[in-house]
């Protein structure tokens, strides 16, 4: 699913401009302001000739008296158009970044689950924050500097040609050499910029993992290891940044050297060809001033090239992400709740074209009944639970909901029918009320409280200083494991979907809490089709059907008592837990 093919610069520019196009009126105003700014600068250079010639050679007192007014008007106008141009270009850039960030985030949210299995949160954050910001530099700072300086270069060259085209042509001979230097550094900076982006993703990833897993890091004494790993990543990032800096230095120094040679050639020509080329002192000094002024914009343009290449590398990374296919979301839209009858027909599944995890899985869950999945680790329990809401697409076979293949239903319609409570509870840095009402944003406070009571969460919520308006911190860090689990259960209760998936839903609770939650879940499960994955077999004894999986195949199925009477795989697992025997090979 990864797309790392290089995109040609022309296509990148064209695609990037499609994001700029909606803001073209402001962009045009900014471009015109920057052109006027450069024109004023070039005009001042031309005025140098007039100032010198009419002030000291052919004295023109009327013109001399106007010089202060010309300077005042020119500098004032220059300042105004500079501010206007800068504001317009920055406005366009930040608008592009806003749209691009929103587009990237929306795309990431709708990517298939198997993309998340490979990509890390650090890499994704780096794309949203760092790579998109590089694009901003292309569409704002780089574009502003490019327009200002390229117009200034054109203006100064025009001034030189008007004053003395013969000497100006000599200077133009240096342009091809400047092009050779810029072309070399272009390729080098673009290549290194890809490495910089990759290392930024690694730095973000390492920091994110260490911060999120700080308890494990500390209890296992991994501080030095994490610091060393982070330092290595930042050092590698620094080295790549220095490679870019070296390329910039070579670029700038080379261009300055070429320009210096050009200036020296013109001075020599003016001295040795004085009998052929007639030029006034003012004209000669104006040409020299123009050439000296050319150094700064030429230097900026060559330095700017590195910024543009970094921005294009960032754009390439972002567009590669945007080119990844989204979840297939075409199908029927269900207007009403389903009854909840689920059937797996000859289901096979493999992750990323690897070996099959599931082999010819067949079973039926009658509407309103509960089915529990048990088996060794890696037997396919979680895979089955993930296939039902189409987190992954089937490799082979069919899953039906009320007789309709789930592939023929829209994802939104299908997932509206399902609630999920998993072992790894996800809470957002928001209030308890908003966490319970996640996905049901129109729920009233009374409905939220009712759901919390059914999940036995209302009691501890009332004891908090702000009650239901208490913020839970990042991923519910301010709550205990049992409290987080109860909030997740309350969220599922409030959704009131006809299908319920319980993936180790009571694993994080103490015995007393589990007793109450189990009672609450039994009430919630009534009338709902429930798929249960549980570690403790004692919690699934009352399931209508228990399915035993081994190596992706169904080896037994029946009620709790029926499976005990078979004295097979399930009976062995149950006895191990019932009598507290330790068997490391058995993980249910």
Swiss-Prot record:
The UniProt entry, under PROSITE patterns, shows: ABC_TM1F, ABC_TRANSPORTER_1, ABC_TRANSPORTER_2, MSBA
Its placement in the membrane is given as: Multi-pass membrane protein
**What SUPFAM superfamilies does UniProt report for this protein, alphabetically?**
ABC transporter transmembrane region, P-loop containing nucleoside triphosphate hydrolases
Q: What is its EC number?
A: 7.5.2.6
Q: Which InterPro entries does the protein's record reference?
A: AAA+_ATPase, ABC1_TM_dom, ABC1_TM_sf, ABC_transporter-like_ATP-bd, ABC_transporter-like_CS, ABC_transpr_lipidA, P-loop_NTPase, Type_1_exporter
Reactions the enzyme catalyzes: ATP + H2O + lipid A-core oligosaccharideSide 1 = ADP + phosphate + lipid A-core oligosaccharideSide 2
Keywords from the UniProt entry: ATP-binding, Cell inner membrane, Cell membrane, Lipid transport, Membrane, Nucleotide-binding, Translocase, Transmembrane, Transmembrane helix, Transport
What is one term from the GO cellular component aspect held by the record?
Answer: plasma membrane
What top-level branch of life does the organism fall under? Bacteria
Domain ABC transporter spans what residues? 342-576
Specify the enzyme's EC class, one word.
translocase
State its role.
Involved in lipopolysaccharide (LPS) biosynthesis. Translocates lipid A-core from the inner to the outer leaflet of the inner membrane. Transmembrane domains (TMD) form a pore in the inner membrane and the ATP-binding domain (NBD) is responsible for energy generation.
Question: What's this protein's family per the entry?
Answer: Belongs to the ABC transporter superfamily. Lipid exporter (TC 3.A.1.106) family.
Domain characteristics, as noted in the entry = In MsbA the ATP-binding domain (NBD) and the transmembrane domain (TMD) are fused.
Q: How does it assemble?
A: Homodimer.
Q: What is this protein called?
A: ATP-dependent lipid A-core flippase
């Amino acid at each position: 699913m990864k797309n790392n093919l290089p995109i040609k610069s022309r296509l990148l520019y064209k695609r990037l401009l499609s994001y700029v196009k909606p803001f073209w009126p402001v962009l045009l105003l900014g471009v015109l302001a920057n052109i006027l700014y450069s024109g004023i600068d070039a005009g001042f250079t031309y005025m140098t000739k007039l100032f010198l010639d009419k002030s000291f050679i052919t004295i023109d007192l009327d013109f001399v008296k106007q010089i202060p007014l010309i300077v005042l008007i020119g500098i004032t106008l220059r300042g105004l158009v500079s501010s206007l141009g800068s504001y317009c270009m920055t406005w366009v850039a930040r608008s592009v970044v806003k749209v691009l960030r929103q587009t990237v985030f929306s795309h990431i949210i709708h990517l298939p689950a198997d993309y998340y299995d490979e990509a890390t949160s650090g890499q994704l954050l780096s794309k949203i924050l760092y790579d998109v910001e590089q694009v901003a530099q292309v569409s704002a700072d780089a574009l502003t500097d490019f327009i200002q300086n390229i117009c200034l270069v054109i203006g100064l060259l025009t001034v030189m040609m008007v004053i003395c085209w013969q000497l100006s042509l000599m200077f133009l001979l240096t342009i091809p050499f400047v092009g050779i230097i810029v072309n070399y550094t272009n390729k080098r900076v673009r290549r290194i910029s890809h490495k910089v982006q990759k290392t930024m993703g690694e730095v973000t990833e390492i920091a994110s993992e260490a911060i999120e897993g700080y308890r494990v890091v500390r209890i296992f004494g991994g501080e030095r290891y994490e610091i060393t790993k982070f330092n290595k990543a930042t050092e590698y990032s620094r080295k790549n940044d220095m490679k870019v800096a070296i390329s910039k230095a070579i670029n700038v120094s080379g261009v300055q050297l070429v320009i210096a040679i050009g200036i020296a050639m013109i001075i020599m020509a003016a001295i040795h060809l004085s009998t052929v080329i007639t030029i006034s002192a003012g004209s000669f000094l104006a040409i020299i001033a123009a050439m000296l002024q050319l150094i700064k914009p030429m230097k900026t343009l060559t330095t700017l090239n590195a910024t543009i290449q970094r921005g294009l590398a960032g754009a390439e990374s972002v567009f590669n992400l945007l080119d990844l296919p989204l979840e297939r979301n075409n199908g029927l839209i269900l207007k009403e709740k389903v009854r909840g009858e689920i059937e797996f027909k000859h289901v096979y599944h493999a992750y990323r074209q690897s070996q099959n995890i599931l082999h010819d899985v067949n079973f039926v869950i009658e509407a309103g009944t509960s089915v529990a999945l048990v088996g060794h680790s890696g037997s396919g329990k979680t895979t089955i639970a993930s296939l039902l809401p189409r987190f992954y697409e089937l490799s082979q076979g069919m899953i039906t909901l009320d007789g309709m293949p789930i592939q023929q239903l829209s994802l939104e319609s299908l997932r509206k029918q399902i609630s999920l409570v998993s072992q790894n509870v996800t809470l957002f840095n928001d209030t308890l009320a908003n966490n319970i009402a996640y996905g049901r944003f129109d729920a009233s406070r009374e409905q939220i409280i009712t759901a919390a009571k059914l999940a036995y969460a209302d009691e501890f919520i009332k004891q908090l200083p702000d009650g239901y308006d208490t913020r839970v911190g990042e991923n519910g860090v301010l709550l205990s494991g049992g409290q987080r689990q109860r909030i997740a259960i309350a969220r599922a209760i409030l959704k009131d979907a006809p299908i319920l998936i319980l993936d180790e839903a009571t694993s994080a609770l103490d015995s007393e809490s589990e007793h109450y939650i189990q009672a609450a879940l039994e009430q919630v499960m009534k009338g709902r089709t429930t798929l249960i994955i549980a570690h403790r077999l004692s919690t699934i004894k009352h399931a209508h059907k228990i399915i035993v999986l081994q190596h992706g195949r169904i080896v037994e199925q029946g009620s709790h008592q029926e499976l005990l009477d078979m004295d097979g795989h399930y009976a062995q697992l149950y006895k191990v837990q019932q009598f507290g025997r330790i068997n490391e090979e058995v993980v249910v």
